[in-house]
Structure formats: structure tokens, C-alpha cells
């Protein structure tokens, strides 16, 4: 009976090692071609490796938690293809595994909780991956239903809706989580939202300060005085990338406060537009489109520095910084410059779901040209982000909240955010950085410019 060895393949771009996270089979199990055998963690992502062999698992040569070099035998398969007269040299088997890993589509009935994609908040439930069904459609004002008078500053809140009394409660996932953290029963809350939904203010009003301290428990201090965490995998890759960027590229940062009221109105209208039914729409979508628009006007910020030359990219692979339980990752939307607003929304949604499931592949994070980090979902006003290696621009989107703002000589409450950009000063001069961020701000202030 023929025994075939499976060698750990290079599933990324020049990766040299990976950690065995979990085995999906045991010795004696029957396996088919393309059946997932093992889950590994590289310096870039978590990857499921399918078997290029058919047969019976002979021996698992590496234990979970062990880090091994590319090309190391990690398990054996007996029989199968050999019995059918099909043999495969080790090198071809390795390449087959890489090809199979790249072609496998991962689906899950429900995304794993816990992973937070910057710009989308906590992972939801009952969300399935979908493809955009109208790839060619672009957002047009005519496609929108008549907009409700948008929340004009000073407008009185909607008529309060009494507690549901056991009926369904309208509340967004972050509001439900806040209510759970504060020990507030949503069915007892009087809703003041525009369509009868429970708002953050409603929950905070219901939960008194005393209940906050009573229901949010502080973890006990561990018995051990110290904890030592081995630096490996994604954390090691993050550390190396941040050190390389911080100490090789001289960062320059600029900031601007922006009236985002019309962006909030535009997002509300998009959610009601027929073409966008079932599509995730948030201010991050407008921000992403604004970045692409501003790059076209200021192409230098979409460059890379090579010591010998500056390479200006005339395409946009738009990175979205994502915080996950495994650490920071920056997948990117390929060729974002050619996407309509609807297509970009679908691409961001796909990127979100993939990151939540921990299935972002190395290729999804390669060849980025400029990045957005949405620290606003964590309640932060702004920051000085570090450049993604190989890029010369990154923009932080701060939280969007109501603040006093002067409009036509009068102080009114408006939705305001702060944009913070970091740039590689070897490539981007201060005037270019300022013009670029001002262009981004102009779209946030008036997103209708995107439709010109």
C-alpha cells in the first residue's frame, strides 16, 4: 500500500513557517481529495489546508501548537490514489494543496462572534455571505425615494414610542449589546428613534448610574503576577511591520474636522434605495468612495517608495484596517477605482464577513495601495495611524457625533467627525497631504459630489 506524505506548502508570498492550529482528522480516518485536513496560522492569516490525496490518514507528524517550516512533512495518507494508479511527487502534491486551498470557498451558517471589522462594529448574527446582484448599478438621486426631512439641527425628537409590552423591539445590534451590558430590558424602554427604534440615549436613560456599576463586573486580578505571551504568528508579523514602517518612513500627520451631517442623510437615503436593499451601508462606504475620488485628484498619495524611484499606482487597492481576535489585519478591496457605489458596498460587505469568519487569505491582504482605519467605531475622535508597509497614505475616520457647529452664522447641532491622515514625508509633501485630506473632507461634507 502506497504512503503519501503531505508537505507544508507556502500558502502566502514567501512565507517560511506556520503554526499547526488544529487537526480536523485523526489517524485511521478516511479522507477525500479537497477535504480540509488541518488549520494553520501563518504570519498573515488563518488557513485551512485541504488534502491533495484520497485514502486513509496514516500518521499526524506534527502536534497542535507546533511551528514548522515550509516543506516539512506534516501528515501521511495511505492507499487512495495509489490504489487507483494515481501517484503524485511531493513537489506536485504541495502545489496541488496550494491550488486547492486557494480555490476552496468557505461558507458558514453564522459568522463567528467576537471579530470586529473596523467600520462595522461587532459581528452580527444570522448574516450570510451574499454577492451583489446588481454589479453595474450606480447610485443615482432619482433611484431614491423622497428623503424624509433629514434630521435637521434643532429638530425635535420623534414622538416617543411606549414600551413594547412583549412585542418586537426595534434596536440595532450595538444598542442591544449596550442594553445587555447595562442590564436593561429593551422591552421596558420607551423608544424615541425616528422609526420607533430604541436609541443609545434611551438605553442610557433607562439604565441609571447605579445599575451600571451594579451590572458591569470588573474581572478579578489573576493569581499569577505576570503572564508571558510568546510573540509569534500574526502578532509577530504586526510588530515587524509596524517597526519597519515607523522607523523607515518619516510620518507626517494632518487633521481636519468635518460636518458629516449630509453623509449621515445620504447613508439613510441609500438604505431606502431599491438597489441597496439587503446591502450593508454605513458612513465607511462613503469614506471609502471619498478616498478613491480624492486619490484620483492627488495620485501621489497612492504611491510606494523604493529608494531608487517612486512608483505611482493608477489603481486603488483600498485597505480596510480590521481588528480581530487574532490581531490587526488589513485586507484590501482590489481595483476599487472601477467600482460603483453599489459594487463597493458589496465588496466591503464581503471583506467584512470574511474577516469575521477568520478566513481572510494572504492574497486578500497583498498589494494594498492606501488604507482606511475607522477608529470611530471604538468611540475615538481621531488618531495618528502608522502606515501600512509599502504605502504612503493612511486615513483615520473618527467617531461621528453631534456637536455645536456654525452654519450660516448660527450655532446648530450637526453630525461632526475628525479625519486624521498620516503620510510618508519622503513622497508626500505637506501641501499634497493637506489637499488630499481636504478633498476627502469635501465628499464627507457633500457626498452628492460623487454623483457628478
UniProtKB/Swiss-Prot annotation:
Pfam families: 2-oxoacid_dh (PF00198), Biotin_lipoyl (PF00364), E3_binding (PF02817). It comes from the Bacteria. It is an enzyme of class 2 (transferase). Its cofactor is (R)-lipoate. Residues 170-207 form the Peripheral subunit-binding (PSBD) domain. InterPro entries: 2-oxoacid_DH_actylTfrase, 2-oxoacid_DH_E2_comp, Biotin_lipoyl, CAT-like_dom_sf, E3-bd_dom_sf, PSBD, Single_hybrid_motif. Forms a 24-polypeptide structural core with octahedral symmetry. Residues 124-172 are annotated as: Disordered. This is Dihydrolipoyllysine-residue acetyltransferase component of pyruvate dehydrogenase complex. The modification N6-lipoyllysine is found at residue 44. Its EC number is 2.3.1.12. One of its GO terms (cellular component) is cytoplasm. The gene is pdhC. Keywords: Acyltransferase, Lipoyl, Transferase.
Amino acid at each position: 500500500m502506497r504512503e503519501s506524505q503531505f508537505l507544508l506548502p507556502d500558502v502566502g508570498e514567501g512565507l517560511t513557517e506556520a503554526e499547526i492550529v488544529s487537526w480536523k482528522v485523526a489517524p485511521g480516518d478516511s479522507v477525500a481529495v479537497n477535504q480540509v485536513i488541518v488549520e494553520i496560522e501563518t504570519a498573515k492569516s488563518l488557513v485551512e489546508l485541504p488534502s491533495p490525496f484520497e485514502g486513509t490518514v496514516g500518521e499526524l507528524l506534527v502536534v497542535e501548537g507546533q511551528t514548522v517550516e515550509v516543506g516539512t512533512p506534516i501528515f501521511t495518507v495511505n492507499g487512495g490514489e495509489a490504489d487507483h494508479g494515481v501517484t503524485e511527487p511531493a513537489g506536485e502534491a504541495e502545489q496541488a494543496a496550494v491550488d486547492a486551498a486557494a480555490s476552496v470557498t468557505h461558507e458558514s451558517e453564522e459568522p463567528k462572534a467576537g471579530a470586529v471589522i473596523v467600520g462595522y462594529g461587532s459581528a452580527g448574527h444570522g448574516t450570510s455571505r451574499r454577492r451583489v446582484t446588481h454589479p453595474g448599478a450606480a447610485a443615482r438621486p432619482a433611484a431614491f425615494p423622497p428623503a424624509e426631512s433629514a434630521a435637521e439641527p434643532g429638530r425635535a425628537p420623534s414622538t416617543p414610542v411606549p414600551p413594547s409590552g412583549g412585542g418586537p423591539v426595534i434596536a440595532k445590534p450595538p444598542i442591544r449589546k449596550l442594553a445587555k451590558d447595562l442590564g436593561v430590558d429593551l422591552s421596558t424602554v420607551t423608544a424615541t428613534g425616528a422609526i420607533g427604534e430604541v436609541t443609545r440615549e434611551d438605553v442610557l436613560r433607562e439604565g441609571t448610574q447605579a445599575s451600571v456599576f451594579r451590572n458591569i463586573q470588573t474581572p478579578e486580578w489573576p493569581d499569577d503576577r505576570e503572564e508571558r505571551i510568546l510573540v509569534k504568528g500574526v502578532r509577530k508579523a504586526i510588530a515587524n511591520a509596524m517597526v519597519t514602517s515607523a522607523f523607515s518612513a518619516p510620518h507626517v500627520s494632518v487633521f481636519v474636522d468635518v460636518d458629516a451631517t449630509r453623509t449621515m442623510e445620504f447613508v439613510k437615503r441609500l438604505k431606502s434605495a431599491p438597489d441597496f436593499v439587503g446591502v450593508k451601508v454605513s458612513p465607511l462606504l462613503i469614506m471609502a468612495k471619498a478616498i478613491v475620488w480624492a486619490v484620483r485628484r492627488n495620485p501621489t498619495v497612492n504611491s510606494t517608495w523604493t529608494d531608487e524611484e517612486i512608483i505611482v499606482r493608477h489603481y486603488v487597492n483600498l485597505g480596510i484596517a480590521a481588528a480581530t481576535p487574532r490581531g490587526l489585519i488589513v485586507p484590501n478591496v482590489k481595483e476599487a477605482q472601477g467600482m460603483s457605489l453599489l459594487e463597493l458596498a458589496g465588496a466591503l460587505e464581503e471583506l467584512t464577513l470574511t474577516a469575521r469568519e477568520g478566513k481572510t487569505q494572504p492574497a486578500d491582504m497583498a498589494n494594498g495601495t492606501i488604507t482606511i482605519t475607522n477608529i470611530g467605531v471604538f468611540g475615538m475622535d481621531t488618531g495618528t495611524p502608522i502606515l501600512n508597509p509599502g504605502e504612503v497614505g493612511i486615513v483615520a475616520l473618527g467617531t461621528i457625533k453631534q456637536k455645536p457647529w456654525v452654519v450660516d452664522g448660527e450655532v446648530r447641532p450637526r453630525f461632526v467627525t475628525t479625519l486624521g491622515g498620516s503620510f510618508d514625508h519622503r513622497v508626500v509633501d505637506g501641501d499634497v497631504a493637506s489637499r488630499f485630506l481636504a478633498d476627502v473632507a469635501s465628499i464627507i461634507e457633500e457626498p452628492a459630489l460623487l454623483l457628478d
